[in-house]
Design a protein with these regions (language model features):
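A charged, aromatic-enriched C-terminal amphipathic alpha-helix characteristic of glycosyltransferases
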Residues: 309-343
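Nucleotide-sugar donor-binding catalytic core of glycosyltransferases
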Residues: 1-68, 76, 84-93, 106-283, ...
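Generic C-terminal helix-cap and adjacent flexible tail
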Residues: 343-350
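Short amphipathic alpha-helix with an adjacent loop that forms part of the alpha/beta core around
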Residues: 71-74, 308
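Short beta-strand/loop segments at the ligand-binding rim of alpha/beta enzyme cores
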Residues: 97-105
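Conserved acidic donor-binding segment of nucleotide-sugar-dependent glycosyltransferases
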Residues: 261, 292-298, 307-313
Length: 350
């Protein structure tokens, strides 16, 4: 089976996405990376209606992207087109594309109505990264309700670029860790109360890193009375930072309904003990209480953090059990090769 994997990334991200997608190829499944980022700024098709406007106007950049994709599919004799990240392919274009089409969702309900659900009819298969959706429906139930033809759970994973493959398990366990608690992620207003509560409880022992504008930083400091300025991290600095951390907090934008981010794998993949939201859905990724710990609110999170900081042996055991699970089941090469089992039966009957 040959898959053209369409994604949009730039710089350091593009390099490792392209490299690691291609490297997952073996005798049974081959991957052809296709980066659709350079043709158009993603802001021009971030929402489905914006893409429809571009398609109606026959935007030259869009047409060049489509022509190049068609040529790659034909030259490679691809069986599958898999589309990830921001989806740039209009349903009327896909309708005439003679290949099995799979849509990969990676943001869940936070962006589903903008760039997922509008395209379901144009794809033969939907691969969703999390089983959660809302208090009313799970993601498979929602996809079924929306008329998706086929759908399967296909989680995100740990890229090799985001951990040090040279380190053995004993070496990861022995890393000197001088940061007690870390959070890495965007400083969304919905996350601020939780982060502020942890910061007030642990002070300098808790470090926050990630994406935050000047306005959000100012609001965060003024609203919660914190001397905390959140700064971004260069991609190449993620691993050294993770290797210094004892415990990592994972907080998703809609709590358990958006569980399944890349951070869910990056933290344990670097030997960081992870405490995450996710509720009843977390066991689709890890064994709760053994490979990961969970929390429901700020008070419970602070209690769990204090528990592990005062019990270093338990923290170390949680961290290394999580590390073993990631190395066994959640690396990107393993995840990509799972597509053969997920897609082959459907492609054969296409």
């Amino acid at each position: 089976m040959k898959i053209v994997y369409s994604f949009n990334k730039r710089g350091f991200e593009e390099d490792y996405w392209r490299r690691e997608i291609a490297a997952a190829s073996d005798n049974h499944i081959q991957f052809v990376p296709f980066n659709h980022d350079s043709y158009l700024d993603t802001s021009k098709y971030l929402r489905a209606q914006l893409l429809d406007n571009l398609y109606y106007k026959q935007h030259p950049g869009l047409l060049k992207m489509y022509g190049d994709l068609e040529r790659v599919i034909a030259a490679e004799r691809a069986d599958v087109l898999l589309v990830d990240n921001f989806h740039p392919y209009h349903p009327e274009f896909l309708r005439n594309l003679d290949v099995y089409k799979a849509l990969r969702t990676s943001d869940g309900p936070a962006a589903a109505y903008d760039r997922d659900f509008a395209y379901l009819h144009a794809y033969d298969h939907v691969l969703y990264h999390s089983p959660a959706y809302s208090r009313d429906l799970t993601m498979p139930e929602k996809l079924q309700y929306c008329g998706a033809k086929r759908h399967d759970f296909w989680p995100l994973a740990l890229f090799d670029a985001f951990f040090d493959r040279r380190l053995s398990e004993p070496q990861v366990a022995a890393l000197p860790r001088d940061i007690d608690i870390i959070f890495v992620g965007a400083l969304y207003p919905d996350k601020m109360p939780l982060l502020a509560a942890v910061k007030k409880a642990f002070g300098r022992r808790f470090q926050i890193h990630g994406l935050a504008s000047f306005k959000r930083n100012a609001y965060f400091n003024l609203k919660y009375g914190l001397p905390q300025w959140v700064r971004p991290i260069r991609f190449e600095n993620y691993v050294p930072l993770y290797q210094r951390a004892k415990i990592g907090i994972n907080s998703h934008l809609r709590g358990k309904y958006t569980v399944g981010s890349y951070r869910l794998y990056d933290l344990p993949g670097n030997g960081v003990a992870q405490i995450s939201d996710g509720g009843e859905y977390i066991d689709r990724f890890y064994i709760p209480g053994r490979e990961i710990d969970i929390y429901e609110d700020a008070e419970q999170l602070i209690g769990r953090l204090d528990h592990y900081l005062t019990r270093p042996d338990e923290r170390q055991e949680l961290a290394m059990q999580g590390w073993r699970r990631v190395m066994k089941d959640h690396r990107i090469g393993t995840r990509l090769r799972q597509l053969r089992e997920l897609l082959a039966p459907a492609v054969a009957g296409h």
